């Protein structure tokens, strides 16, 4: 092996005191930059504000290039996720940058994903047969679509994430955000790193 292939990094944060998490996402992604240098982005929600108002910014480039200070000043929220990408599935194009943000019948869903699935073709074909149209070439979008689909038939987004997780085969770590909730999940064997931390009420 020529070297370690880090293959993406994910970050999620929720400030229970209502503070702005955007600076923390920026510094978190900067700390994770070694895990992916192709693209990056963030998605945030203000749980005190308009319901379903998820704002996001993503593009090709390093954290310092994509999330410049003049850009991040436009974003504010007390809940958010971020992503740095090293592509293993899907092309290195702006459309494949994350987080992915979907609007669907139950509202808005944002997802950042690290990992590889071995059953992506089967999961994608199931969605295509039911009319899904894909805008990226990533397995991350397949996961997001399945969560949204399950959410239509479940009581909570947590239930939808768990039902989707049972379908996934492979190594993965995900952070999933609805306008008022943040969920982190990894594969049962813990092959992809996902750490939980606490700072004050964040």
What do these predicted ranges mean?
Residues 1-202:
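Conserved short alpha-helical segments that host acidic/polar catalytic motifs at enzyme active sites
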């Amino acid at each position: 092996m020529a070297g370690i292939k880090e293959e993406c990094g994910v970050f999620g944060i929720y400030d229970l005191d209502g503070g702005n998490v955007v600076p923390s996402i920026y510094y978190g992604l900067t700390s994770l930059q070694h895990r992916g240098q192709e693209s990056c982005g963030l998605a945030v929600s203000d749980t005190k504000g308009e319901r379903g108002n998820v704002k996001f910014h993503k593009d090709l480039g390093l954290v310092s290039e994509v999330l410049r200070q003049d850009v991040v000043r436009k974003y504010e929220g007390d809940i958010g996720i971020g992503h740095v990408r090293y592509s293993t599935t899907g092309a290195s194009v702006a459309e494949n940058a994350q987080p992915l943000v979907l609007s669907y019948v139950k509202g808005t869903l944002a997802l950042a994903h690290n990992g590889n699935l071995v059953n992506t073709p089967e999961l994608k074909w199931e969605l295509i047969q039911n009319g899904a149209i894909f805008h990226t070439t990533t397995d991350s979008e397949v996961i997001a679509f399945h969560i949204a689909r399950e959410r239509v038939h479940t009581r909570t987004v947590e239930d939808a994430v768990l039902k989707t997780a049972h379908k996934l085969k492979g190594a993965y770590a995900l952070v999933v955000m609805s306008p008022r909730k943040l969920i982190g999940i990894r594969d049962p064997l813990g092959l992809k790193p996902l750490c939980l931390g606490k700072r004050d009420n964040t």
